[in-house]
A protein has these predicted regions:
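Bacterial N-terminal signal peptides
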Residues: 1-8
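N-terminal catalytic cores of secreted or lumenal carbohydrate-active enzymes
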Residues: 18-190
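Boundary at the C-terminal end of the N-terminal hydrophobic targeting segment
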Residues: 13-15
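Aromatic-lined carbohydrate-recognition surfaces of secreted/lumenal glycan-active proteins
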Residues: 142-154, 175-193, 211-215, 241-263, ...
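Structural preference for beta-strand elements that scaffold enzyme active sites
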Residues: 31-40, 71-79, 141-147, 208-214, ...
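Extracellular glycoside hydrolase catalytic/binding regions
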Residues: 192, 216, 220-237, 242, ...
């Protein structure tokens, strides 16, 4: 009912074209069965390295323990990006509300899709990495799962300039989309989802599976919660997006920052998996206590995100502080009954896990092995 009210009369001719489920979508339940999802940022030229090739994925796919035995590592991967620097026209664009640059339009959304589906990177490279690991260990019980980011349909061409145009995104079926209309924002999101589905279907992957989508904003601002609702109107498109991806048997995932606007009501808006960020890794003031975090996620039935970056490597200043905080995540998850009961996601900066896996420093090796053992022995995985 809500989606129908929001959509109104919009892009009807386009909507009528898109009710077909692909065969692999028909066979699937929308309930996501994966336990440990690692975040992979990519698509913008400022990322170093830029490409996600099979060598970069390899440590995330398989882990060799200290006895020389190989194990499957992360069972799911979130491909995401929030900004575009060095794109086709050289300008800077934002995929999420609140970031610097022009709001990304249809061309930039297409660039993001192109990046993840390019030959030798993204989906293709992950498929290769899993195939090669399968040659050594045999096929895993299930395909590795992929969740792909969804850009914000940002209201204004410059997100905080209400004098800038709302008709900047591009056309659908020959009609210019105007993001002052909720239905046009939803139509753009549906176009994006359909383009991703079409591109994935054409690839015929055997070792990976596209299972969900992820709105890039870390807060869901509504009239009664959050800042600058007049610039965001998040509630106009989240529930319709959830309804749309569910129609094709995908899950909708979200990772809000600690106590972000919308975290209490996310499940009622249609999200299937909500991993809240503790933000403890960067907490210099002590105002994001882990005890409060665990109470929050239990009360609101949320999953947990782990957080680390390259800063925990021994070569970096204050690495001991960051290592200690990361151990707090593992110890806290076990202490509070999250480990083995709730799904987990892992923020690792741009390349943190890869660099940790390649380090020869004894402290780094210990952390790497402790963390990998934590992931591969997740009791929840054994039930899937």
């Amino acid at each position: 009912m809500l989606a129908a009210v929001l959509l109104g009369v919009v892009a009807d001719s386009y909507a009528q074209k898109r009710d077909k489920l692909y065969s692999w979508e028909k066979r699937r339940d929308i309930k996501p069965e994966f336990t440990d999802m690692v975040l992979c940022y990519g698509g913008s030229a400022h990322r170093t390295p830029f490409r996600w090739d099979k060598e970069r994925f390899a440590p995330m796919v398989a882990y060799t323990d200290e006895a020389g035995k190989e194990h499957w590592m992360f069972d799911s991967f979130l491909f995401l990006e929030f900004t575009l620097k060095g794109g086709a026209d050289g300008a800077q664009y934002s995929y999420g509300t609140g970031y610097y640059g022009f709001s990304a339009g249809k061309k930039q959304w297409a660039e993001l899709i192109d990046y993840w589906f390019a030959e030798g990177t993204g989906f293709d490279a992950l498929e290769q990495a899993v195939r090669e690991a399968s040659g050594r260990m045999g096929k895993p019980k299930a395909r590795r799962k992929v969740v792909l980011t969804v850009p914000d349909p940002i209201l204004y061409r410059v997100y905080n300039d209400t004098m800038s145009t709302t008709a900047y995104w591009g056309e659908l079926d020959g009609r210019e989309m105007d993001f002052s209309k909720a239905g046009d924002r939803v139509a753009a999101l549906e176009w994006y989802v359909d383009e991703v589905r079409k591109r994935y279907n054409a690839k015929h992957y055997k070792y990976i599976e596209l299972v969900g989508f992820y709105p890039i904003s870390e807060e869901i601002v509504t009239p009664d919660e959050g800042w600058n609702y007049e610039l965001k109107h998040s509630d106009e498109f989240i529930s319709p997006l959830a309804e749309y991806v569910h129609k094709y048997n995908y899950c909708l995932c979200w990772i809000p920052y600690n106590r972000a606007a919308g975290y209490r009501k996310a499940k009622s808006m249609g999200f299937d998996l909500v991993y809240m960020q503790p933000n403890h890794y960067w907490d210099e003031k002590g105002d994001k206590p882990m005890e409060r975090f665990f109470t929050d996620i239990e009360e609101h039935d949320l999953a947990m995100e782990f957080e680390f970056e390259e800063t925990l490597l021994t070569r970096n200043e204050r690495s001991d502080v960051y290592r200690r905080r990361f151990y707090d995540y593992m110890e806290g998850a076990k202490k509070h009954g999250v480990y083995g009961r709730k799904q987990l996601s892992y923020y690792q900066g741009t390349n943190g896990f890869y660099e940790l896996s390649k380090s020869s420093d004894p402290k780094d090796r210990k952390l790497y092995n402790d963390f990998c053992q934590f992931v591969i022995n997740n009791p929840l995985r054994k039930r899937h």
